Amino acid sequence: MDLFMSIFTLGAITRQPAKVENASPASTVHATATIPLQASLPFGWLVVGVALLAVFQSASKVIALHKRWQLALYKGIQFVCNLLLLFVTIYSHLLLLAAGMEAQFLYIYALIYILQIVSFCRFIMRCWLCWKCRSKNPLLYDANYFVCWHTNCFDYCIPYNSITDTIVLTSGDGTTQPKLKEDYQIGGYSEDWHSGVKDYVVIHGYFTEIYYQLESTQLSTDTGAENATFFIYSKLVKDVDHVQIHTIDGSSGVVNPAMDPIYDEPTTTTSVPL
């Protein structure tokens, strides 16, 4: 308890003018230098503040977040909490160092610093994934993989949990009312309609890039689901430069990443001859 109270009441480090003692004119080598430290801010209240932020951060995970601004707000709070945790760690480390109690907590601080480095590296990797996907979604969602396709109008990036042999993309049919609330859905994630789908999609991960080719479509009348069209993609084992595709007119060609989407809008009449 005494050790806890001594840490809880530590203050901020304020450097005072230093002085040199025991220095005689005849001896310029042997001297004692002292740098007084003054506590001016209670360290304990800062710990309480960070603890409250951590509780708020954990409580926010219980609330379902669906809108992008809610996800952005949550990630912003999480980022601020991580910065405050890093500040408190360095701040308390300096205080314990000044109080001569660093040795008792050296291993704990080493572990905290390692975790902070891992968190920072993860943030850098998510930024790199954003660059690969041309989207901010990797910073908003915690998924390991993202299904991406790019059109002239929009860069689609939908979170995906694992690598599978088949990807099923659910879309509103564009003709029947009422339409689906979200136009493109994969699993529990969705993306609003901005442009059409393409012959292929790509799964991006930290060290993963897997291409999937459109194999078939299933309409609402085939599945019994209302107002929905299902685009089924299968994993490719061929080289990317020699991927054969099937277009609306039945001709085959080579996948061109810059090509226009073959579906301007998913409709009940959309089909792909195989």
Curated annotation (Swiss-Prot):
GO CC terms in record: extracellular region; host cell Golgi membrane; host cell plasma membrane; membrane; virion component
Membrane side Cytoplasmic: residue ranges: 56-78, 126-274
Residues the UniProt record annotates as site (Involved in polymerization): C133
Compartment list: Virion; Host Golgi apparatus membrane; Host cell membrane; Secreted
Keyword Transmembrane helix carried by entry: yes
Membrane topology of the entry: Multi-pass membrane protein
Domain CoV 3a-like viroporin CD, residue spans: 145-237
Transmembrane spans: 35-55, 79-99, 105-125
Span of domain CoV 3a-like viroporin TM: 33-141
Entry keyword Repeat: no
Main location: virion
Function: Forms homotetrameric potassium sensitive ion channels (viroporin) and may modulate virus release. Up-regulates expression of fibrinogen subunits FGA, FGB and FGG in host lung epithelial cells. Induces apoptosis in cell culture. Down-regulates the type 1 interferon receptor by inducing serine phosphorylation within the IFN alpha-receptor subunit 1 (IFNAR1) degradation motif and increasing IFNAR1 ubiquitination.
Subunit structure, as described in the record: Homotetramer composed of two homodimers linked non covalently. Interacts with M, S and E proteins. Also interacts with the accessory protein 7a.
Protein name stated in the entry: Protein 3
